[in-house]
Every structure is written in C-alpha cells, then in structure tokens.
C-alpha cells in the first residue's frame, strides 16, 4: 500500500468516525444544568464573570456557547471526541490505536457516559479538559523515548506564546485537571533537566501558563467559600483529610475510577496475559521469584475482574452493604497495585519503562484531588478513563514491538470495526428515541400553554438511565430552569408523569 492510499484510508476512517459521532451528538438532549446555562441564568453568571460561582472560566464560556446552538454543540462534541482518538493514535504511533480507542470509548461506563458526554454541561468541562491536556502530552511525549530525536532538544521560541495559552486553558476548565497540569508542567521540566541536562524554554512557558491559570481560577471568591465550608453545595474535607479521603474512596472512587470499567479492565487483563505468556517463552527468569511475582499479580487481577463482572451483572442495581463495599474497595487497591507492578516490570524488561511510568502516574495524579472534595460525580472520571485507555494501548505496544503474534491483523480490525459499528448503532437507536420524545414533549407543553392551561403534565423520556437529570419534577429547581430554557411561563406548573392521564 503506497503513502497516498494510506493517507486516503486514514482520512476515510476519521471522516466516518466524525460523521457517526456528529449524528449521535445531534441527538443528545439538553438536560439539568444545561437549562440554566442556556437561559438568562447563564447570562447572569457571565455578567458577574462567574464570581462566587466557579473559576472554570474556559469551561463556563464553552457551555454558554454550546447550550445556545445544537449545531455548535454537535460539532464541538464530535471534534473533541474524534480529537481524543486522533491524539491517542499520535501518542502510540500505530494505526491500531484508532480501533482500540473507539471500542474502549464506546464501552465507557454508562454513568460516566451520561454525565461527561451526553450532558452538555459535563462535556464542556470533562471531555474538553482531557482533550486540551492530551495536546500538551503529545507535544512532550517524545522525552520518554529510548532514543529521542536530539533536534527536539533545542530551545524553541516560536511555540512559547501558544504554550502559555494552552497552559492557561488547561487550568481554567475543571479543578482536578488544573492541578494535574501544574504537576505535569513542573514534572516535565524536572525530567528533562535530570535526563538531558537541559531546561527548555517551551516547557517553562507551558508551566508558567499553568501557574497563571491556576492562580486565576482559585482567585474566584467561591473557593474561599468552599474552603471554609460556607458553600451550600461543595466542601473540602469536613471531617479531616484522611476521613474525607476514605469516605470518597469507598463511596464513589473505587467504583467509578476502576471497578466499573469492566470492558477496559478485561481488555487490559487479556493484554497482560499475552505479555506474560510470551515473556515465559522468551525468558529463563520466568521461573524464578520475578516470574512468581508476575503470576501472583495476574492471579489477583483475574480474580478482581471476575468479581467485578459478577458484581456488575448481579448487583448493578442493588444497594451494597458496608461489608461488601469494604471488600471491593480493598480488592481494588490490591488489583491496582498488581497492575502497576506487572506493567512496570514488563516495561523494564521490554524497554518501555518511562512511558508506562508516566501514564501510570498520570492516571493516579488525575484522580488524586478527588479524594479531598465533596461532592464528586461519575463525570469526574472521564479524564482518568482516557488515560487508562492510553495505559492499555502502551501495554499493547509492548506486544506489538516485542512479540510475533500469529493473528491476522485484518481479522482484528474487522472485529474492532464490528464492535464499534454495533455500539454506535445501539446508541443511535437509544438517543433517536430520546430525541423524538424530547421534541414531542416540548411541543405538547407549548400547545397546552397556548390553550391557556396552567397545570401541565410532562412525560418522562425513554432510556432515562442514559441521561443526566432528564425530567424536571414539580417544585424542584430544575422545573424553574426548564421553563426558563424553553420560554415557558413561570406560573405554569409541570407535573412529571410516565403516562399522560388523558
């Protein structure tokens, strides 16, 4: 296959991906806080420059724009998600990354999907933040190569302004990604200094941008209210940092961060087994203590993934008791440590250590701030999930670079395309029904308002488990915001029902 044909196929697969994601994004309804951002409430927040609301200035501006145009929203969602897939492929430098990324993103846990992707307000913070962060990771990823391009170690003035701007953008969207980017900025400078004995001006500029952005974000008066527990919604470590961290971990983090990633975890486990089997064939060390450590790590991960699968199937809609939560939370720690140990040992053996270590630290660092704040939702874990996908693909790169696997690549690609295609059609069916019902109910309400009725029934949407805050209930704050967004008189009462009474 010549270069032109490869480029044509590359453009074709991304064009198809873009088209399907655009169609899907178009069907996503505006829900929950979207109704506030897209109404006068959003403009009021803008007029005060979000004072005492949040320091997510870039994220706030994005959601203000996206809640005013479904076309703009659909284009932004499509561009960001396609961009994430493209940037992951740039990091891995293999075309198979495209197919793995699509399959694993389609298998995103439902709770994360509805809060971080389907919900426009969630997308504006959590998808955009990791998209912009990946841009900088792509820019610096070469520093972890075994034999880096020495030409890249030169001082470059030209990109400095753009890097300062990128650093500021990455620290003005969502808080945990803000802190991650500050750590990323200084860590890159220190790593390059110790490994290459240089300090590159472009890295310093990015770090300076993150410092400026972080200072500006946390200068918002809302963070003083949060830190003093005077905010009515958000708080920091009320009962002490350790007790808050334990509460957050066992209540939310272990499930949303790791355990609920069923498909991703099983995929990583399969790749680990492929690596281990080939390692045993190649190395005499596989029979010594190191080999036993690797086998033990695999055993723990296998038991954990099996438990996670059974827990998801059997207890997915059941409130778990304290004992089970403690067992699962503790098992998650054991499985996570086992995965890191296994990956780092294999990375050392197959000369991929620094990239694996960087991604592993990134996954941990991205979630670390969530231990200290309250509340945290499923949407907070989308950036971590994307980094987990990168981690999985780095493990795949160990396989691709070091082993001869007797599997037809075309078959693997067809399997991935089939899974991705079925997944997209599944979601298109789900959200086409949601889109139709959403437009029908607003038309119904407007007809009733035109007829002079003051008490109107509002029908629940189908498949509400895929949507965040889909239907306003009478007396809730969402009822007021829904009416503002759709220009329904405030003296009209909306009563949510599953079936119209007449």
Which residues fall in each region the model found?
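Intrinsically disordered, polar/acidic, low-complexity terminal segments
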Residues: 3-49, 53, 63-83, 93-97, ...
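Transmembrane catalytic cores of multi-pass membrane glycosyltransferases
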Residues: 23-72, 120, 175-186, 190-343
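Membrane-interface micro-motifs in multi-pass membrane enzymes
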Residues: 52, 103-144, 174, 322-341, ...
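Transmembrane alpha-helical segments
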Residues: 81-92, 132-144, 183-191, 267-275, ...
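Transmembrane alpha-helix segments characteristic
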Residues: 99-108, 207, 285-310, 348-371
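Short hydrophobic alpha-helices at membrane interfaces in multi-pass membrane enzymes
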Residues: 142-168, 204-205
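Membrane-interface alpha helices of multi-pass inner-membrane proteins
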Residues: 156-186
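Signature aromatic-anchored transmembrane alpha helix within multi-pass, membrane-resident enzymes
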Residues: 291-299, 332-334, 347-364, 398-427
């Amino acid at each position: 296959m010549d270069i032109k044909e490869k480029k044509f196929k590359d453009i074709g697969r991304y064009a198809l991906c873009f088209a399907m994601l655009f169609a899907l994004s178009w069907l996503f309804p505006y829900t929950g806080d979207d109704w506030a951002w897209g109404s006068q409430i959003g403009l009021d927040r803008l007029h005060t420059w979000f004072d005492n609301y949040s320091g997510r200035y870039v994220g706030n501006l994005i959601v203000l724009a996206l809640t005013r145009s479904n076309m703009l929203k659909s284009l932004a969602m499509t561009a960001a998600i396609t961009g994430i897939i493209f940037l992951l492929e740039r990091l891995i430098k293999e075309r198979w990354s495209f197919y793995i990324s699509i399959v694993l993103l389609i298998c995103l846990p439902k709770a994360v999907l509805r809060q971080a992707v389907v919900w426009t307000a969630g997308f504006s913070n959590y998808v955009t933040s990791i998209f912009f962060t990946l841009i900088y990771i792509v820019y610096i990823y070469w520093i972890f190569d075994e034999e880096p391009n020495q030409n890249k170690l030169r001082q470059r003035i030209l990109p400095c302004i753009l890097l300062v701007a990128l650093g500021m953008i990455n620290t003005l969207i969502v808080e945990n990604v803000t802190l991650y980017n500050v750590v990323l900025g200084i860590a890159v400078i220190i790593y390059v200094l110790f490994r290459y004995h240089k300090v590159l001006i472009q890295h310093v500029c990015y770090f300076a941008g993150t410092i400026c952005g972080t200072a500006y974000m946390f200068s918002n008066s809302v963070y003083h209210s949060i830190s003093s527990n005077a905010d009515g919604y958000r708080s920091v470590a009320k009962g002490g940092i350790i007790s808050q961290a334990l509460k957050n971990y066992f209540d939310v983090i272990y499930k949303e961060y790791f355990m609920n990633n069923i498909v991703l975890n099983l995929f990583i486990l399969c790749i680990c087994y492929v690596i281990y089997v080939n390692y045993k064939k190649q190395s005499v060390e596989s029979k010594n203590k190191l080999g036993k450590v690797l086998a033990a790590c695999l055993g723990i991960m296998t038991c954990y993934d099996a438990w996670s699968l059974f827990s998801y199937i059997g207890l997915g809609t059941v409130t778990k008791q304290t004992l089970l939560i403690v067992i699962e939370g503790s098992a998650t720690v054991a499985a996570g440590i086992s995965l890191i140990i296994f990956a780092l040992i294999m990375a050392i053996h197959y000369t991929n250590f620094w990239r694996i270590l960087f991604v592993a630290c990134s996954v941990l660092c991205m979630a670390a701030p969530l231990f200290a704040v309250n509340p945290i939702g499923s949407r907070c874990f989308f950036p971590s999930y994307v980094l987990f996908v990168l981690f999985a693909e780095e493990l795949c790169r160990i396989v691709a670079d070091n082993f001869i696997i007797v599997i037809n690549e075309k078959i693997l690609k067809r399997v991935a395309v089939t899974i991705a295609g079925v997944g997209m059609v599944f979601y298109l069916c789900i959200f086409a029904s949601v889109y139709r019902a959403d437009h029908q109910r607003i038309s119904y309400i407007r007809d009733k308002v035109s007829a002079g009725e003051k008490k109107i029934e509002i029908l629940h949407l189908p498949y509400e488990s895929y949507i965040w805050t889909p239907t306003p209930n009478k007396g809730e704050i969402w009822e007021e915001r829904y009416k503002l967004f759709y220009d329904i008189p405030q003296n009209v009462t909306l009563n949510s029902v599953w079936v119209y009474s007449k």
